[in-house]
Amino acid sequence: MTCAYIAFTARGLALAQQLAAACPGSVARGGADGVRLTDWTAAQFAQSDALIFVGAAGIAVRAIAPYCRSKAADPAVVVLDEGGRFAIPLLSGHLGGANELAQRLAAVCHAVPVITTATDGRGVFAVDEWAKRQNCAVAEPERIRYVSGALLAGQNVCYAADWAVSGTPPAGVEPAAAADRADFALTLTPTGEALHLIPRIAVLGVGCKRGTTAEKLETAFAAFCAEHHFAPQGIVRAASIDLKKDEPGLAAFCRAHDWKMDFYTAAALRTAKGRFTSSGFVQSITGVDNVCERAAVLAADGVLFIPKWARDGVTLAVALAPFAPDWRWKNDEP
């Protein structure tokens, strides 16, 4: 977690430095003798995982207000008073990790963590916190409230999962009789009105003709996802043959999605384990019978999930890394 601290008094700055020694991050002083708060907030909201204000809660609220978008995108925001008495998560308590961070910071300076999320206050299963712990993206953040609201009202909720989930489901959580009856679902192929949690375990294998533009790749990718009902949030990186290292369109496409790119030689691609779609033409050009499937499997160190798909000179495939979800959702659980 990338942390950024800001304080407004000498006493607050000393506390920020103490906290940063335990939970590393940059430390700035705001006000007349330091950085402009608006500039600092704009920059850190875009580049940091957590913003920690040491000062009045009102200062923090006014500073972050113009930048708040959604619980799925916003960084964690925590505020501590300059005396180190209270640590209050203001934003992204679950998905952004602000609740956990507030508790960690409170332990450093012997403050009281003030956790205000209802599920935490009542000890109720927090589906968004569980999603974060299982390394899942939340496809529809606006649906979190339906699951949490039902549990807080004492109602049971039903889940569906495309993987076996080890352990015992939390109180109030039970398997759905059918996938279309689930209140939340662990899946890479979301359909229906449930809250969908998308495991971030997928690698996109890419093949393309020389000179393929980022726009053409984007169009192909959108069609690929639509045809397979595949959630793009599940992809964490992309992979191809080393002959594509200098393709500007491919590089721009991956940058737009914030994906790292792995490149493999033809010899390395031939070592991939599994059954792949063979092409004599691809073999004649690249030295290996398939690029997208083999590259995806190697980068994922896993198994092929969606086989080769081709359109307009672009080939795509998806492989999955190993995934073993469990029902733990709080850090104090074994």
Residue ranges and their predicted role:
Residues S148-P175, G274-A296, A300-A310, A319:
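Long, charged alpha-helical interface segments
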Residues R29-A32, T116-A118, Y264-A266, P307:
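Conserved beta-strand termini and adjacent loop/short-helix elements that scaffold enzyme active sites
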Residues T41:
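Conserved acetyl-CoA-binding loop-helix of GNAT-fold acetyltransferases
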Residues F8, G12-Q18, G25, G34-R36, ...:
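Conserved mixed alpha/beta catalytic, RNA-binding, or beta-rich assembly cores of soluble enzyme
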Residues R237, I241-R294, A300-L304, R311-V314:
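C-terminal non-catalytic interaction/assembly regions of soluble proteins
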Residues A72-A73, L197, A299, W309-R311:
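A generic structural signal for short, non-catalytic loop/turn and secondary-structure boundary residues
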Residues M1-Y5:
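Extreme N-terminal starter segment of soluble prokaryotic enzymes
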